[in-house]
């Protein structure tokens, strides 16, 4: 949430969109001499010789490394390293995602039926719950895992992106609402689940006065998140947040006393994606903590 405050933001929103953070970090890294290899495909990694082979613009390239940090999903590094034992062990974790996202575009600012006198309250987060008890909440969560239900209403978290951008004095052609949805079964794409999108709209539009101003909606299911962003099973946090996969258990290091972020039994390969800390696949928090640990490790040698 604080990332928005750093880059001309407000309560987690970032002026111009969250991708502005990576643009600003890129500027910082370039200024201190970091080299970038964009649009590149890693062919192989030789962990003994500490060499990375990759293709860029159909040309073979090779670079050396002293320390290697992966900010990907947890499985991909094991595949690139061709470490089948480690891959098999990591794949035993629960990667299932049951969250979807709908972006609704309005041609005029959204007007809520239950307004607030507080300044800028239109930009606040909202939660719409479909369950009345914790027991029902749990049943709804499990329903899309154990049964054939494609959608079992749990809650909808509403990001008032359009109102937030107005607070930040950023003019955009449409007013956006983003609905983060629970619970959607992993399997079908958003295009195949139009009835789910319509159900979510039905729930949300009860709270909005000017529903006629909604001109378009885009729906991403867990399957879409897998196909577009390569999350193993459509989980934006890469792994499920459940038993033995929370915070201090969320690592792949065989020597956590040396470093929580070491990857497998490698001495100089690290992992800092959302699989190590549930931060919506943004490696900012884990990247920083991993870098701090690595710096201490280097300084101690």
Describe every region a protein language model picked out.
Residues 41-169:
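Mid-domain catalytic core of redox enzymes
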Residues 35-54, 218-231:
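Beta-rich nucleic-acid/ligand-interaction surfaces
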Residues 272-298:
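A conserved FAD-binding loop/helix module that cradles the flavin
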Residues 209-277:
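A glycine-rich dinucleotide-binding beta-alpha-beta segment and adjacent secondary-structure elements
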Residues 75-79, 105-107, 171-203:
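Conserved FAD/dinucleotide-binding core of flavoprotein oxidoreductases
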Residues 69, 179, 204, 269, ...:
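Hydrophobic, well-ordered secondary-structure elements that form the walls
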């Amino acid at each position: 949430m604080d990332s928005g405050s750093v880059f001309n933001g407000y309560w987690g929103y970032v002026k111009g969109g969250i991708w502005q953070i990576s643009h600003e970090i890129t500027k910082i890294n370039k200024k201190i001499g970091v080299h970038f290899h964009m649009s590149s495909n890693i062919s192989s990694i030789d962990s003994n010789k500490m060499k990375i082979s990759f293709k860029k613009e159909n040309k073979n390239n090779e670079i050396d490394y002293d320390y290697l940090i992966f900010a990907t999903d947890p499985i991909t590094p094991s595949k690139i390293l061709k470490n089948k034992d480690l891959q098999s062990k990591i794949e035993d974790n629960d990667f299932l995602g049951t969250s979807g996202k709908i972006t609704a575009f309005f041609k005029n600012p959204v007007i809520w039926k239950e307004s607030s006198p507080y300044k800028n309250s239109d930009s606040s987060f909202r939660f719409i719950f479909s369950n009345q008890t914790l027991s029902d909440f749990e049943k709804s969560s499990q329903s899309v895992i154990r049964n054939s239900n494609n959608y079992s209403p749990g809650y909808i978290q509403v990001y008032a992106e359009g109102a937030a951008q107005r607070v930040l004095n950023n003019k955009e052609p449409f007013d956006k609402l983003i609905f983060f949805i629970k619970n959607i079964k992993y399997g079908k794409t958003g295009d195949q689940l139009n009835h789910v999108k319509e159900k979510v709209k039905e729930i949300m539009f009860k709270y909005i006065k000017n529903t006629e101003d909604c001109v378009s909606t885009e729906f991403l299911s867990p399957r879409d998140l897998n196909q577009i962003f390569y999350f193993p099973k459509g989980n934006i946090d890469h792994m499920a947040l459940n038993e033995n996969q929370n915070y201090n258990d969320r690592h792949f290091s065989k020597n956590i006393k040396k470093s929580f972020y070491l990857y497998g039994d490698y001495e100089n390969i690290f992992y800092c994606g959302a699989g190590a800390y549930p931060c919506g696949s943004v490696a900012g928090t884990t990247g920083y903590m991993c870098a701090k640990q690595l710096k201490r490790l280097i300084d101690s040698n």
